[in-house]
Amino acid sequence: MAESNFIHDFIDEDLAAGRASTVHTRFPPEPNGYLHIGHCKALVIDFGTALKYGGLCNLRMDDTNPAKEDTEFVDAIKEDIHWLGFDWGDRFYYGSDYFEKTYELAEELIRNGDAYVCELTPDQFREYRGDLTHPAVSPYRDRPKEESMDLFHRMRDGEFPEGKYTLRAKIDLASGNFNMRDPVLYRIRYIEHHRQGTKWCVFPMYDFAHPIQDALEGITFSLCSLEYEDHRPLYNWVIEHCSVPSKPRQIEFARLNITNTVLSKRYLRNLVETGIVDGWDDPRMPTLCGLRRRGYTPESILDFIGRVGVSKANSLVDIGLLEHCVREDLNAKAPRRIAVLNPVKVIVDNYPEDKTEYFDVTNNPNDPDAGTRKVPFTKELWIDADDFAEVPPPKFFRLKPGGEVRLMSSYIVKCGEIVKNEDGTVKEIHVTADLETGTGTPTDRKIKGTIHWLSAKYAADARAILYDRLFTEANMNDLPEGKTYGDYLNPESAVVMEKAKVEPSLANAAPGEKFQFVRIGYFSKDTKNPGVFNRVVSLKDSYKPQ
């Protein structure tokens, strides 16, 4: 957020003109689900803008809609924000804290003739809404103020069923902006609120509550996504017609859309509830808790958001950019370790049965201070099945009958006898080591292939899960007619390697600790299941930054 953008330009103009003296923003998530990468853009813009100008950013739970809101989500949202490195200080609020004041301001609108109680049913409301050439209609628009006030009080007292009455703003039934055609401000709902319990049975609509909450908190710049641009006139109307202590300015920016991903809370909830994924923190989910469990770092996510930038135009961002950012971050700081995901046994025929020697292996070639570690070498080894081909394709430089390869950081070996199981699969491969090559390749021999390995005696057992994109279709926001996201689920989004082998030290890796498995990819120790390593991202990067 260090770079300037059009939001900063607007703020600079207001500060210079004296329309604002401070920069005070807010991040108002609805606590009915977990934050995802899309929310992260808004979060970074809100907190980042305040940081840029030395201002403040409030955290406000937008819990005016009681349906599906839960303290579980409140706690998770706080954890995610702190994980990304932001803090709201002592400025944590709930939208429901303002219910009483919001109700009083609704009464003020009624007294001033700016609101009325309407008893159109939802079907009638749609029928009388009009179109671009015909104004909306409400036979209750001229209801006396005293009658509207009495009905509004009785609505709060619980005298009427849901849908019987609403409170509507009196603005302009002929407006070309349908949001201004006497929008509903309050509706009756008999549902328990996660904080207020059953105290309230009338709840304010978002378009009414939100500007009031901003104004009561002294917010100067209300930054929100582009779908609220058409709601801005209503936002301003509420501020102008209610006795509130400040006049915030709403500024809209484009939402974040990413390829091969759905960011709709409804769809994400469905993925969880139908068991397609294993909870909100499934490592394939775009939720921040899912990305964190998979192994994404805060730095990589913030780098991604920074590269995407802030614009007014909606666009579809290649998920490859997000993968590129975490790959760059982990390449710089993740220690290297050896893992054999699909092991096949190798026996070094000319190596002593009872001997163990240790080879020095670099921890991170990008960080000289990371030093080296000792990796044990014994007669029996594990190599990856992909590094052997009995009938090799052209330009196959790994292990093959009669061929030579270097075992990484150790000896050159030559392939000899191949022993098979009854079903024809390879049971073990016998090799002969050139024991004079432990410290480097002789100058008279060219060895094109180097493969990784582990001692069969010392390697630890593990499970590795190769996570990939959850959906095969790039633009999940524009599916062909008749298709749903379920038609594009990637059957290989989580490939489990049940019999993986890893360096012995990895048996004691801390949950969430990250490594580069050499020649494979970047992995993170799972935070829930012992002995499981989640692939964060593959080693190779086909994405080309613009």
Feature annotation, model-predicted:
Residues E3-D12, A16-E79, H193-S225:
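N-terminal catalytic cores of NTP/NDP-binding nucleotidyl/phosphoryl-transfer enzymes
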Residues L59, D63-N65, E108-L268, V326, ...:
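Active-site cores that bind ATP or allylic diphosphates and position pyrophosphate for catalysis
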Residues E69-W83, E108-R111, R293, T297, ...:
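Charge-rich, well-structured scaffold segments of protease-associated domains
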Residues F73-F99, L105-A106, G113-A115:
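A glycine-rich helix N-cap at a beta->alpha junction
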Residues Y228-R232, N236-V238, L302, G306-V308, ...:
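Core subunits and conserved enzymes of cellular information-processing
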Residues S246-C325:
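Long, charged, mostly alpha-helical binding arms that flank functional sites
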